[in-house]
UniProtKB/Swiss-Prot annotation:
It comes from Klebsiella pneumoniae subsp. pneumoniae (strain ATCC 700721 / MGH 78578). Its EC number is 2.4.2.1, 2.4.2.2. GO terms for molecular function: guanosine phosphorylase activity; purine-nucleoside phosphorylase activity; thymidine phosphorylase activity; uridine phosphorylase activity. The gene is ppnP. Belongs to the nucleoside phosphorylase PpnP family. It is an enzyme of class 2 (transferase). It catalyses: a purine D-ribonucleoside + phosphate = a purine nucleobase + alpha-D-ribose 1-phosphate; adenosine + phosphate = alpha-D-ribose 1-phosphate + adenine; cytidine + phosphate = cytosine + alpha-D-ribose 1-phosphate; guanosine + phosphate = alpha-D-ribose 1-phosphate + guanine. InterPro entries: Ppnp (IPR009664), RmlC-like_jellyroll (IPR014710), RmlC_Cupin_sf (IPR011051). It comes from the Bacteria. GO terms for cellular component: cytosol. This is Pyrimidine/purine nucleoside phosphorylase. Keywords: Glycosyltransferase, Transferase. Catalyzes the phosphorolysis of diverse nucleosides, yielding D-ribose 1-phosphate and the respective free bases. Can use uridine, adenosine, guanosine, cytidine, thymidine, inosine and xanthosine as substrates. Also catalyzes the reverse reactions. The keyword tRNA processing does not apply.
Amino acid sequence: MLQSNEYFDGKVKSIGFTSSSTGRASVGVMAEGEYTFGTAQPEEMTVVSGALNVLLPGETEWKVYAAGEVFNVPGNSEFHLQVAEPTSYLCRYL
């Protein structure tokens, strides 16, 4: 079953799903802006198109992840994103 989600006044939209190959995941698009997300469990984020400037928990420097690149976020934490252009992503819940 698909589940639609909308965050930050519609600037981030995702569709959640579960599949045998991916497990529980969501795919979505972020408009330009700055966002802070909280995690309940570890997440693996893959940038599909565009780029994300990311500040991960415990880090002091931002890092840019371009299309095809992956980063991991620990559970029970927050991470910060800066988005300069519409960017799509796949988030796997680990």
